[in-house]
Amino acid sequence: MDFLKVSDKTTIPYRSDSLFSLNQQQYKESSFGFRDMEIHPHPTPYAGNGLLGCYYYYPFTNAQLKELERQAMIYKYMIASIPVPFDLLVSSPSSASPCNNKNIAGDLEPGRCRRTDGKKWRCAKEVVSNHKYCEKHLHRGRPRSRKHVEPPYSRPNNNGGSVKNRDLKKLPQKLSSSSIKDKTLEPMEVSSSISNYRDSRGSEKFTVLATTEQENKYLNFIDVWSDGVRSSEKQSTTSTPVSSSNGNLSLYSLDLSMGGNNLMGQDEMGLIQMGLGVIGSGSEDHHGYGPYGVTSSLEEMSSWLAPMSTTPGGPLAEILRPSTNLAISGDIESYSLMETPTPSSSPSRVMKKMTSSVSDESSQV
C-alpha cells in the first residue's frame, strides 16, 4: 500500500494494482485530452464501495464519475450473482454523451418511458432497450405514413388491357389484279383488309370487300360493251349491216366515225329509237316518212348506218363540208327536206334537217 501526499495534513491511500490505476502521463496521452474536457483543478477524492472503496487522484468530469459509479454497481451485482436492476443497464443520454450535458437535464427515472402530456402525466411503462420510450409510444414521434400515390387512372378494357396503351399493327392491303381473258373484262374482286384494330371489346379482324351490287352493275355493262366491240370488229370487214331475225338492226352494228370511237353513244342511240323511229317505231305515215318528215325505211337508213359509209371527221366535218345532194320533196304541205341516201349522210345531218323542217312548219301555220 502506497500513500500519496495531497497536502501536509492529508494522506490518501493509493493502490497501485487497482482496476482503474492510470498515471497522469497516460491520461494526457488518451483520446479525451485536456482541451475538450472540463478538468478539475485539484484532485477529487472519490468514495466508492467494495473493491473500489478508495480515493482517486486523477481528474475526471462529473459525467465520467457517474458512469464509473454505474459500472461499479453493475460489477458488484454480477459478483454477488444478483440480477442487475434495469435502471443500471440503461445508460442515460447525458451520461453517454458529455456534450449533451448542458442541453438535456438528467432524467430522474431513466428506465421509465418519457412520454408525457406536457404537464404532469408521464407513462409508467418501461422503455425499450436503447430507446427513450416504451413499445406503445416508440413510434409516436415519427410522421405518419402517407397513402401510396397511385399512377394516373387509365380505363381498363373488358379483357384487362388498357385503352391508353393500344397497339395498332398495320397490314398491307391486298389488291387482286384484274385478268383479261379472251379480250373480255371479268368482274374484278377488290379485297381490302383493314389493319389489325384492337377496339374496346377485343381484337378483331375486319375484311371489307369492295365488290358491291353497284360495281357489279358497272362491270356487267363493261362486259356488254366488250361483246359489242368484238362484234363490231367482226362486222368491220363487210359493208352491209347485220340485221336480226325480226328485221331490226343489231345494236352493235350502228357505229359512227366519232374521232376514232366506232361505237355509237348511248344518248344518240336513244334519240334515234325514240324520235326518229328507226327500229320499228310504228309511227310512219302513208308516204313512208316518220315523224317530222324524216324517212324511216330500213334500206335508206342502212346507207348511213353502215360502218363503211361513214365520213371521216365526224359530225363536225359533215356540217362544215358543203353538200349539193339535198332534194326537196314533192309534198308541198309538209315542206320536209329529205336527203338522198349518199355516203356522206349521218344522223347529225338528219337532226339538222329535222329542226329546219319544224321551224318551217311553225312559220307556215
Swiss-Prot record:
Record-annotated QLQ domain positions: 59-94
Pfam families in the cross-refs: QLQ, WRC
Segments for region (Disordered): 137-187, 332-365
UniProt KW keywords: Activator, Nucleus, Transcription, Transcription regulation
Cellular localisation: Nucleus
GO biological process, one term: DNA-templated transcription
InterPro entries per the UniProt record, alphabetical: Gln-Leu-Gln_QLQ, GRF, WRC_dom
Entry GO CC: nucleus
Stretches assigned to the WRC domain: 107-151
Induction: microRNA 396 (miR396a or miR396b) negatively regulates growth-regulating factors (GRF1-4 and GRF7-9).
Biased composition (Polar residues): 337-365
Basic residues bias locations: 137-147
Protein family according to the UniProt entry: Belongs to the GRF family.
Protein name in the entry: Growth-regulating factor 7
Highest classification ranks of the organism: Eukaryota, Viridiplantae, Streptophyta, Embryophyta, Tracheophyta
Gene giving rise to this polypeptide: GRF7
